[in-house]
């Protein structure tokens, strides 16, 4: 509930006691003589007996049926209507005029129907709506009145009905609370009174909450899990007697209610089933205790439309233009725990059934994953099941490419804190200058790097990606149409671990390479050619000529298929010559059959991302003294000028002082 102010418009025939209700409610006493129509009255939160359920302010709007224009104006700005009648004539007018009039205005707001002037009622009797407060401050509401039932059946916009008396103060606070509750805890999204069932969206939300609360994945909520859910949602323990009452109630329903006679709602020694959890919340809705259900739903960030709050799924994160987003230690820890929780057979991999259970409380696999052939975009075991290493690598890639997807799925998985705590933003990329050229500075705070693998078709790019994931070489050639991704972790000297993303661009290669914004996501470009194909290297030369801005990025030349006979390239310049001309390393000769050469390449790519200056074209080696951060140079120069100016000013003052003393 995000509304801070609720507007309650009080309607009804002349003489039913609308103004008296307002005065008696606010003054706590009955005043016989008052004006016909009261001005709007604002009631603060602390007036309510249940401040947790109340908005910041509730405005009561008194109306008169003699001025329909003013009445309609107020109705159109109302959040809830308090419709009052007091006798047979005004009761008939409710269904013959008032409710049809609301419909004619196109209003889609709840109506609280109130029978006023019930002065003879001193307590709730069998003919009135029973309203009582139990030990948990929940409201149990039941309509048992011959007047109310027919009108409730005909007009679904009526939220509930109540009898009041302005003269004796009977149920005034309760009526006011029901007006608030119709907005703060609406019944309509949860329960379909016409069929007597929870609505589909409510069922979906409650099923997801059950799955997240079933910590041991046994399909039952045992006493400890119920206690945990109770503390999480209501910040207090559940009474043993109340818990036993719930169990007995569910057992009784499953034995005697024909609808549930063959369905287990509670199993002694195991706990409440998913069906039992749904039935319990259905009972809350039927008895007017849907505040309980809403408390559960809102703890899990559901809005009034029963979707998870978008601000929770996609929190705003300030990311500078040259920064990237990675998982924090807390994020990695949570994802490790999720993996271990759903690895039921403890074989170190998530099979299809385990993945299905894991993603059951989400909308399904992320779109990024389905478009990149998950799980074969990362490390899988010999059964094709994603390993923990592959799981963490996949989420590292997802966070780097689209952190908003990660925050959403963290919430879906049940991450309890602000999803931003599971992420960390790297420092903005600094630029340095050497030989008049700007290039990227060294990196020391990142663990995830992105590499575009480009080259002529059939030069071995796909085999390179497969080898990166530890898969054996295949002789079968399959051209890459859509972009492909491979992500894995690797360890450099010193034991520091990094995640490397290799992207093969497919038919989108030209479009991506000419998109300078897309290239900002790229840390290294791996220029691959087939050393056994004399026509292969010319493709790279033409790319570098066409997209000259590629030379602003670190480049790594790779000569693939080195196990085959090396061919002279039919090109105006040979690979080694071009590398020398660009001041980058000579091509690294690799083969999918030589594992050591592949490992050397992946380490080389990562090192190029960490130290861009050694691999960016057009940067001849210079002494460290000449290769400095251009911002630092400006700072040092400015400091020097300032120091000289200060010394000059001091000397002038000393000179003038000396001259004056003479």
From Swiss-Prot:
The keyword Repeat applies. This is Mitochondrial Rho GTPase 1. PANTHER family: RHO FAMILY GTPASE. GO terms for cellular component: ERMES complex; mitochondria-associated endoplasmic reticulum membrane contact site; mitochondrial outer membrane; mitochondrion; outer mitochondrial membrane protein complex. Residues 1-634 are cytoplasmic. Its main location: mitochondrion. Mitochondrial GTPase involved in mitochondrial trafficking. Probably involved in control of anterograde transport of mitochondria and their subcellular distribution.
């Amino acid at each position: 509930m995000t509304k801070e102010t609720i507007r309650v418009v009080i309607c009804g025939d002349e003489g039913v006691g609308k103004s008296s209700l307002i005065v008696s409610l606010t003054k706590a006493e009955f005043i016989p003589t008052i004006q016909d129509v009261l001005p709007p009255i604002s009631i603060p939160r602390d007036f309510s007996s249940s401040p947790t359920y109340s908005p910041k302010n509730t405005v009561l709007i008194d109306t008169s049926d003699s001025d329909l224009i003013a009445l309609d104006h107020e109705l159109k700005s109302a959040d809830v209507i308090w419709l009052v009648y007091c006798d047979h004539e005004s009761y008939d007018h409710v269904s013959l005029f008032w409710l049809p009039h609301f419909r004619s205005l196109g209003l889609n707001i709840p109506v609280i129907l109130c029978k006023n002037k019930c002065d003879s009622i001193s307590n709730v009797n069998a003919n009135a709506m029973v309203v009582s407060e139990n030990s948990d401050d929940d409201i149990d509401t039941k309509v048992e009145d011959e007047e109310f039932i027919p009108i409730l059946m005909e007009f679904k916009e009526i939220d509930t009905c109540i009898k009041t008396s302005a003269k004796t103060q009977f149920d005034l606070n309760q009526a006011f609370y029901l007006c608030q509750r119709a907005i703060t805890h609406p019944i309509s999204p949860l329960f379909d009174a016409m069929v007597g069932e929870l609505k589909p969206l409510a069922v979906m939300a409650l099923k997801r909450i059950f799955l997240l609360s079933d910590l041991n994945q046994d399909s039952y909520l045992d006493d400890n899990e119920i206690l945990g859910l109770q503390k999480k949602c209501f910040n207090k323990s559940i009474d043993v007697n109340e818990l036993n009452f719930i169990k007995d109630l569910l057992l009784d329903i499953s034995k005697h209610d024909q609808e549930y006679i063959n369905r287990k709602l509670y199993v002694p020694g195991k706990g409440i089933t998913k069906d039992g959890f749904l039935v319990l919340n259905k009972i809350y809705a039927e008895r007017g205790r849907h505040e309980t259900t809403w408390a559960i739903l809102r703890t899990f960030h559901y809005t009034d439309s029963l979707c998870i709050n978008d601000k929770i799924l996609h929190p705003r994160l300030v990311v500078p233009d040259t920064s990237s987003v990675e998982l924090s230690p807390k994020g990695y820890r949570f994802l490790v725990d999720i993996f271990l929780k759903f690895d039921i057979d403890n074989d170190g991999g998530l099979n299809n059934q385990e993945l299905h259970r894991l993603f059951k409380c989400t909308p399904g696999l992320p779109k990024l994953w389905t478009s990149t052939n998950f799980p074969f975009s990362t490390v899988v075991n010999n059964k094709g099941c994603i390993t923990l290493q592959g799981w963490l690598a996949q989420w590292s890639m997802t966070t780097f490419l689209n952190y908003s997807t990660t925050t959403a799925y963290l919430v879906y998985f049940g991450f309890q804190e602000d999803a931003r705590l599971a992420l960390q933003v790297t420092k903005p990329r600094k630029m340095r200058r050497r030989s008049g050229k700007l290039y990227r500075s060294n990196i020391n705070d990142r663990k995830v790097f992105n590499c575009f693998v480009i080259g002529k078709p059939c030069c071995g790019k796909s085999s390179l990606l497969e080898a990166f994931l530890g898969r054996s070489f295949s002789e079968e050639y399959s051209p890459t149409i859509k972009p492909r991704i491979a992500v894995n972790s690797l360890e450099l000297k010193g034991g520091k671990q990094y995640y490397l993303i290799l992207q093969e661009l497919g038919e989108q290669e030209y479009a991506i390479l000419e998109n300078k914004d897309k290239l900002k996501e790229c840390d290294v470009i791996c220029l691959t050619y087939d050393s056994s194909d004399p026509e292969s290297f010319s493709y790279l030369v033409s790319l570098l000529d066409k997209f000259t801005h590629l030379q602003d990025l670190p480049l790594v030349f790779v000569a693939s298929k080195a196990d085959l006979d090396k061919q002279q390239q039919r090109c105006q310049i040979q690979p080694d010559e071009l590398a020398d001309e660009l001041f980058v390393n000579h091509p690294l000769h690799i083969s999918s059959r030589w594992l050591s050469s592949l490992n050397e390449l992946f380490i080389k790519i990562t090192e190029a991302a960490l130290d861009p200056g050694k691999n960016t074209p057009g940067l001849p080696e210079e002494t460290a003294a000449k290769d400095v951060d251009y911002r630092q140079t400006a700072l040092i120069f400015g400091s020097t000028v300032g120091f000289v100016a200060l010394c000059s000013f001091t000397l002038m003052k000393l000179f003038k002082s000396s001259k004056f003393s003479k």
